[in-house]
């Protein structure tokens, strides 16, 4: 029935307890090294998973075939500048005069799926900024050129012209890179098979090497550096600025709890507020005091984090050694909250076939393992207009049909709601 694919929808009812487990807090720390040169992948259950240099990679491409995200490592000195003087036909005549007035773009710090190259979609429905989706080949074909600055601020700083040629239907990314004068013109393929079970595949253009950055999916948090919009008091503008912060793995959810002492938190109030936010933990737990030249920590700021395994943890920070040591100190506590979890393949349920065949039926596949549960399916178009809805009862392995007859080609959102839990998937009808 599922065509050799497993789709799971598991909802474990929330526990009735309102307080965290009555146990001691566990103190822990991670070491990013002097100068904060390293990043640390961390599991709330098992501690540090792996440590590696922040500067190893320069480009990252999604492992999700229905996504098109390309991220840049800004901390390693990578800058992405949109080329305004032509499309890919201008490759041979690439002209950098006046480039300092061109638009520089950065990764989104909240959405895993928005990198510097696809931060803002283009004017067309299938335009993802760096490329356009081809419904016949199911590829994203690059239609834009970029100026890449590698190693900005270092003696080895270089300028490259860059062309994301295409993302093929297997999820590989083919890119073309050359010096501005056209020399050293090289095409690389970032292969999906090189990063099986990971969020991204990574590449270092300078060294012409594939990079193995991520460990397996057995991590929840990443202690690293990233560029965040930061208010600059000198210019009065908000500018991208490198900060040391904590990113979340895909599937790790969190919510910041302000103004409540950690031992008085009513967990059931916040359980349904956890959300998917790349920097949901982030960097706001610390502030550098310009008077004392020391870091100050928010005593009443605690994070409720739902880990990859579905367990809920409380987390608060107690110290940061800055660039002198790179050590981060924190306390964590596993709660007695039961998990509200969509398990397996990402968040666990899915729509298939996707892309759909226009006029044919698509299906939502679910598998509820904990009794009957009321739910609803809702489908909306790109403008948010409802085109289909159905109330359903989830109970065991099921599939629900959604007719697409009469629907125009486009990108649609299909939402599955049960109680306070709402999850959304995108459906493409070519």
Functional labels for PLM-detected ranges:
Residues 1-6, 430:
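Positively charged n-region of N-terminal signal peptides that target proteins for export
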Residues 18-22:
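Sec/Tat signal peptide C-region and signal peptidase I cleavage site
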Residues 184-186, 385-391, 422:
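Surface-exposed loop/edge segments in extracytoplasmic proteins
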Residues 364, 391-419, 428:
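Short, surface-exposed loop/turn motifs with a glycine/proline- and acidic-biased composition
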Residues 378-387, 412:
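Short, glycine-anchored, charge-dense loop/turn motifs used at functional sites
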